[in-house]
Amino acid sequence: QVSEFVVSSEKVPESFSGYRIAQISDLHNAQFGEDNAQLLELLESTHPDCIVLTGDLVDSRRTDVEVAVSFGEEAVKIAPVYYVSGNHEARFTEYEEVKAGVSDPSFQTGFPSDEPEEVLRWELDQVSSETDGYWILLSHRPEYFELYREFGVDLVFAGHAHGGQFRLPFVGGLMAPGQGFFPKYDDGLYTEAGTSMLVSRGVGNSLFPFRVNNRPEILVAELRSA
């Protein structure tokens, strides 16, 4: 499924009005057709100007790096790709191999804490003074939305929640990692105090091998100058 959203802001330059960003999240080594041909065909049909990958391309329980690498190699033929890792990449043994050779203009090491929220706060503090334009953040974790809002991020792309795994009519998602039962941020667009966050339901599964009322999705955001 392709889910499309329009995100408007007066900070979006006129030259970027209509810019399309396609998001893939939480692949978890899933394959849709041989070498993910079906997924890539659907991705290309969205006519993205760029593609963002928001973590967990692999699954730490059944890691197959080749599936993730192959998908990335084909995705960059469609449009420029920007990638942020998720908790499953961080847990598997080949993580250093995946990072090797990645060109990152602002790579940080030596974090002041082992707590994810404190590391994230420290990182946001490092970059918050570097931009006065429209600030787009890729973060695997949607549960830190209040922190993103505190730092004035304009648009966040997140995943991790798997759409709440089992979606109940009139209720929404049943549970999500990092948020527990009846998660607050599990699907779609959230906007508060000038910060918008798009949470993808993702395309793959991890601990639970199936979904209920919760189709895998490619999320597309079209930026508009307000």
Predicted regions and their residues:
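Active-site-proximal beta-strand elements of phosphoester/diester hydrolases
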Residues: 18-28, 100, 106-109, 113, ...
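Solvent-exposed loop/turn segments at secondary-structure junctions
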Residues: 29, 57-60, 87-91, 108, ...
